[in-house]
Curated annotation (Swiss-Prot):
GO terms for cellular component: cytosolic large ribosomal subunit. Keywords: Ribonucleoprotein, Ribosomal protein, RNA-binding, rRNA-binding. Belongs to the universal ribosomal protein uL3 family. Residues 57-98 are annotated as: Disordered. GO terms for biological process: translation. GO terms for molecular function: rRNA binding; structural constituent of ribosome. One of the primary rRNA binding proteins, it binds directly near the 3'-end of the 23S rRNA, where it nucleates assembly of the 50S subunit. Pfam families: Ribosomal_L3. The gene is rplC. This is Large ribosomal subunit protein uL3. Part of the 50S ribosomal subunit. Forms a cluster with proteins L14 and L19. PROSITE patterns: RIBOSOMAL_L3.
Length: 157
């Protein structure tokens, strides 16, 4: 990767991400050079944004925790407590079947979050809602694709 940074004449960065945008939508971004710093002046207070990040990994989880399935009876001779149940008369596993497995560590997009405040000095946003991933994790903030109407916005708040 050092060759890429040398060719772009920039210092090595922790994350590299290519983001496509339309020049007529964001005229501020049309004249940016490769490796230039993008500040938070693209968004204002009250804008709706989509936040994409990698959710926290939870490790191996059973079907009750992973897919919110019901558990079996706990007493009266039951041996079926936290198991996924019968798979039916099938050969092999069906794709997408709700079974135990790895939970979390997936790319997640939370849509239509409102920007409450913008700090231009520290280059920070205050976003209302859940942002995926751990503290100090890498997220991508884009303008909302599925904009809410005024009635939906009031119902959400």
């Amino acid at each position: 990767m050092l060759g890429h940074f040398k060719k772009a004449t920039t210092a090595p960065k922790r994350f590299i991400k290519e983001i496509n945008f339309s020049a007529d939508v964001n005229s501020n971004l049309a004249n940016l050079a490769v490796g230039a710093l993008i500040t938070n002046d693209l968004f204002q207070v009250g804008d709706l944004v989509d936040v994409t990040g990698t959710s926290k990994g939870k490790g191996f989880a059973g079907s009750i925790k992973r897919h919110n399935q019901s558990r079996g009876p706990e007493s009266h001779g039951s041996r079926y407590h936290r198991r996924p149940g019968s798979m039916g008369p099938i050969k092999g596993k069906l794709k997408g079947k709700k079974l135990p497995g790895h939970m979390g560590h997936e790319t997640v997009t939370i849509q239509n979050l409102a920007i409450l405040s913008v700090d231009t000095e520290k280059n920070l946003f205050l976003i209302k809602g859940n942002v995926p991933g751990p503290n100090k994790g890498f997220v991508i903030i884009k303008s909302a694709v599925k904009k809410l109407t005024k009635e939906q916005t009031h119902a959400k708040n």
